């Protein structure tokens, strides 16, 4: 029996995709960015508030300065395929952290397949953060007896790159 099988606990899966638009000021631009994110994701985004006052920029603490939406499950996988297609199915190798997460940006949201240009929205850029997970990662977030994930169970950047190549056919540059 020289056949080696991987443990089912080591199987990597997509946990969530977070789309974020930071516009830097409140008002109509927040509504425009919110409509753009809703057009991309099909979900209603939530406003993100400023953590501190920046007098030079005219931003007050608690004022909405960005919008974000979190997508999970099968919708996240379908959306990620569209977002990667907008980037030409390539991801920079430096976009990965030591825990299997990665981020990238899109300069113009109209590059995403299925998104049409609307003059009332204009052209906006956005940031995308992708989180990968394994079975057993729930011990970090449960309410009782929280624990850290063991060192050998953490997703490395190389494992995340391999997952992307295998699941989405992406080239890592």
Curated annotation (Swiss-Prot):
InterPro entries recorded: Ribosomal_uL5, Ribosomal_uL5_arc, Ribosomal_uL5_C, Ribosomal_uL5_dom_sf, Ribosomal_uL5_N
GO MF, one example: RNA binding
SUPFAM superfamilies: RL5-like
Gene Ontology BP terms: translation
A Pfam family: Ribosomal_L5_C
UniProt keyword list: Ribonucleoprotein, Ribosomal protein, RNA-binding, rRNA-binding, tRNA-binding
GO CC terms in record: cytosolic large ribosomal subunit
Role according to the record: This is one of the proteins that bind and probably mediate the attachment of the 5S RNA into the large ribosomal subunit, where it forms part of the central protuberance. In the 70S ribosome it contacts protein S13 of the 30S subunit (bridge B1b), connecting the 2 subunits; this bridge is implicated in subunit movement. May contact the P site tRNA; the 5S rRNA and some of its associated proteins might help stabilize positioning of ribosome-bound tRNAs.
Similarity remark: Belongs to the universal ribosomal protein uL5 family.
Assembly: Part of the 50S ribosomal subunit; contacts the 5S rRNA and probably tRNA. Forms a bridge to the 30S subunit in the 70S ribosome.
UniProt name for this protein: Large ribosomal subunit protein uL5
Species whose genome carries this gene: Nitrosopumilus maritimus (strain SCM1)
């Amino acid at each position: 029996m020289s056949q080696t099988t991987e443990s089912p606990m080591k199987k990597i899966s997509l946990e969530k995709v977070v789309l974020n638009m930071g516009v830097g000021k409140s008002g109509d631009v927040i509504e425009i960015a919110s409509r753009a994110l809703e057009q991309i994701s099909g979900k209603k985004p939530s406003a993100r508030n400023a953590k501190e006052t920046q007098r030079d920029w005219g931003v007050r603490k608690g004022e909405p300065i960005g919008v974000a939406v979190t997508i999970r499950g099968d919708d996240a996988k379908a959306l990620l395929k569209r977002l990667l297609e907008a980037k030409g199915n390539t991801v920079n190798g430096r976009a990965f952290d030591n825990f299997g997460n990665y981020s990238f940006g899109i300069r113009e949201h109209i590059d995403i397949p299925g998104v049409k240009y609307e003059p009332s929205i204009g052209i906006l850029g956005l940031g995308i953060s992708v989180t990968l997970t394994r079975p057993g990662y729930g011990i970090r977030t449960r309410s009782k007896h929280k624990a850290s994930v063991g060192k050998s169970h953490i997703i490395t950047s190389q494992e995340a790159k391999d997952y992307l190549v295998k699941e989405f056919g992406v080239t890592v540059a």
